[in-house]
Amino acid sequence: TMLGPVQKAWLKRELKASIAPFKVIAAGGGWSSAENEDGGDSWGVYLTERNEIFDFIRDEAIEGVVLISGDSHMGELNCIPRSGQGGYDLYDLCSSPLAQMPAAKHTRQTPEMRVRDTWTRTVNVGVMHFRMRGDTPTLSYTLHDVLGEAVWEPLVLTPDDLKNGVRSWDRLADPLELERLERFKQGKGYYGYDPGPDWPNRPYYDAE
């Protein structure tokens, strides 16, 4: 278990009680299945418990949940599609490192869905901007490089994107990432070349 029964009960209770349009759950390690190496410390190693939390969010109709994480040694913007299972698509906003060298390990990884290409050129920081005035609150997320420049087009979410039955991942993903996903679904390498025999086995995650 990643959380243990006391922390998990607290998390579920606070999520259910919150009336905020956006509810941010922060974790030290990534939420996607990408980093599921043996002995790892991300949620990719604790998928049963992770999915229990995601099922709770769906079953209790808790809207507006967004995930943030770090410690992947590269900038990422991933999605765990849950709309095909009666929930909604959960976005993992991941920035790192800030004080170490980045690691180009993305070629060995395939999360459920990449929304933007990984950033491994420089240290980086993620910036979340909430606009709560007006009729439609928005959350925007961008990743910035060592010079403070944005490296992606921002991801912009509204509360309507984060409610049961709403599918948004393919609408918000970069076309390049959708192309890579289609290639992966056909049994080919996600990044255009076949994985090595010693690479972790990560079958296509069917978001339908």
Name what the model sees in each region.
Residues 1-207:
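Long, structured stretches of catalytic cores involved in phosphate-ester chemistry, encompassing
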